[in-house]
Amino acid sequence: TAALRDMSVTRIVLTAEQIAEQAVTREIPDYYERDRRIDAVLTHRIWGLPVMLLMLMVIFYITIAGANYPSQWLSEAFGSLGEVLRNGLISLSVPKWLESVLIDGIYCVLTWVTSVMLPPMAIFFPMFTLLEDVGYLPRAAFNLDKYFSRSKACGKQALTMAMGLGCNAAGITGCRIIDSPRERLIAVLTNNFMPCNGRFPALITLIAVFFAAGASGAVSAAMLTGMIVLGAALTFLWSRILSGTVLKGMPASFALELPPYRRPQIGKVLVRSLLDRTVFVLGRAVTVAAPAGLVIWLMANVHAGDSTLLAICADFLDPVGRFLGMDGAIILAFILGFPANEIVIPIMLMIYMGQSTLTEAGDTAMLADILGRNGWTWVTALCVMVFMLCHFPCSTSCLTIKKETGSWKWTLAAMAIPTVTGLAICAVISWAARIFGII
């Protein structure tokens, strides 16, 4: 039985500790006691989880505060380079439509994705890798293990969830650390409930405009942490549902080793986080962003009568969007943002403003004015944030799921699970808002 197995493992570990105490000589006699004193706080039955959430909020605050200016500088630099390239094409007498396709379509989307993704990843991934190198991540898995046990999933899934905060594709690949095929598949199917840093800018922007206007960055970080907690709760819920239905089974035995705390090797941390994670993820995103730019340009510039294809599709989807507390432009932006979540908000603005290329609002006041004139309320913003948290994975993540599972069936399931969840929650929010006369 499980109880007998746990008892046997406990006895083996205690015996091994007794043998080690008699046979091992330590250069630093009190290192074990030092680690245990730290663990008494970080893995405490009551305080361990709040401390973990506080650390997460600090990481988000540093990422939010640190990424703003580099993103702006990159955007301005790419804008200047775009004008140089445009002038070069004009000097070569390139047809106007081809110039617009290359610059306003492909180049604009590529550079937008890069300027939005690169700075947060360059900050988040090193901090994440630093926690990994120090030895904290196994403690985080320990804090969450009881919740995964109740969900009949593996505690190692906590590590893949943390990786998903940087990039869901990286988190899905990280599911290889889970030995059980059943539990590994559960982790893959639910990883998208963790918002990646491609979704952070949209969440942060909407929080700043509708919920934390004039407040400090700490308020935005706290609200963003709240969205992470909601994503984690949905992960536990769906892990339990999958474990009790299509992926039945008991959780495999999980021996979680808490390694000693160690001094991080900063050089290796930077190289591993920037090259193995940041550059890898950015390369995949850029690869799929180029064809997306072409499709978006075509829809924004091809007319049927007096309207563009973009406007026609938005009008067609409007009844569905209204039912979900949003509108057709928002739904279409999510669909066209399938290659990269970073371009969802710019596509919305492009539709609202009738532009033929991706549009930047400039500042939160201007964005609030544009959204307000198009019927947005705090309920709309809340529904968009929920759907940003719970919708189909981006194309990079979908390709990674297909590669890891070897099945289009499970890839479609990974797309359907968060999307159905998001649609249901948005419908409930919209229904409740109508019942109470808010909208």
Where are these regions (language model features)?
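Core alpha-helical transmembrane segments of integral membrane proteins
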Residues: 42-138, 142
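Extended, low-charge hydrophobic alpha-helical regions
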Residues: 68-109, 151, 171-187, 294-419
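Transmembrane helix-loop junctions at the membrane interface of multipass transporters and ion channels
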Residues: 197-223, 396-407, 428-439
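Long hydrophobic segments that form regular secondary structure
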Residues: 244-252, 261-318
